[in-house]
């Protein structure tokens, strides 16, 4: 049940018309805990530091399957922070990580063969649920056969294939920086010089439309 009339079915329009963040108080008051927390703690202060989950993952002694998507706009980094926290603070635990070509929660509801026009060749979402998630739960909840999962199962979007890794980052890998350059170019190591007349490397942002 809606507690107040937004005045529009378009949530984006509601917040664009709202104006300053302080104006939201007349709608939300103190009844939305998460919103209140954000307003009361606008920086990474002691309140948020105490609630940073990875630091508390000590002595975990049960199987863990961490799942994320390369296209997750809400909390992509959290997957890797959780995995690193478990590997560091509970190194002997049965921990696995899976990252596929999905958006936020897409591994649980989508076919997974396409994302915004990008074809992946297989039904990655359905394959995950039937070949990874189900065997994992069967093994640990129903004493089924081993799920045979690697430490990290990662989908390579450029090659449209799954990679089984004994560690993450993989042993022998070298971190590189992908840097945006002028004219919409992307380079590895150092940004490419502008080649087109009038090309700009300054990012453009317009809240309306974003």
Stretch-by-stretch model annotation:
Residues 1-59, 145:
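Accessory cap/linker subdomain of secreted extracellular hydrolases
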Residues 76-95:
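Active-site-adjacent alpha-helix of alpha/beta-hydrolase-fold enzymes
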Residues 71-75:
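Acidic catalytic loop of the alpha/beta-hydrolase fold
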Residues 68, 97-102, 156-158:
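Short glycine-rich catalytic loops that host catalytic nucleophiles or stabilize transition states
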Residues 1, 30, 63-64, 112-121:
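Flexible glycine/proline-enriched surface loops and loop-helix/loop-strand junctions
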């Amino acid at each position: 049940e809606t507690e107040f009339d937004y005045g529009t079915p378009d949530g984006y329009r509601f917040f664009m018309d709202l104006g300053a963040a302080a104006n939201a108080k007349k709608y939300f008051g103190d009844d939305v805990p998460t919103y209140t927390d954000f307003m009361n703690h606008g920086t990474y202060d002691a309140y948020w530091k105490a609630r940073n989950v990875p630091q508390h993952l000590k002595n975990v002694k049960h199987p863990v399957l961490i799942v994320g998507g390369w296209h997750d706009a809400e909390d992509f980094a959290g997957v890797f922070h959780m995995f690193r926290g478990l590997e560091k603070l509970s190194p002997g635990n049965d921990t696995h990580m899976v990252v596929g070509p999905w958006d936020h929660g897409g591994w649980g509801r989508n076919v997974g063969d396409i994302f915004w026009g990008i074809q992946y060749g297989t039904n990655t979402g359905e394959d995950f649920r039937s070949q990874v998630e189900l065997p994992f739960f069967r093994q640990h909840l129903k004493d089924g056969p081993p799920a045979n999962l690697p430490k990290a199962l990662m989908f390579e979007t450029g090659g449209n294939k799954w990679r089984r890794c004994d560690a993450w980052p993989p042993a022998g890998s070298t971190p590189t920086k992908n840097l945006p350059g002028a004219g919409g170019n992307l380079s590895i190591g150092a940004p490419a010089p502008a080649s087109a007349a009038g090309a700009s490397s300054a990012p453009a942002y317009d809240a309306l439309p974003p």
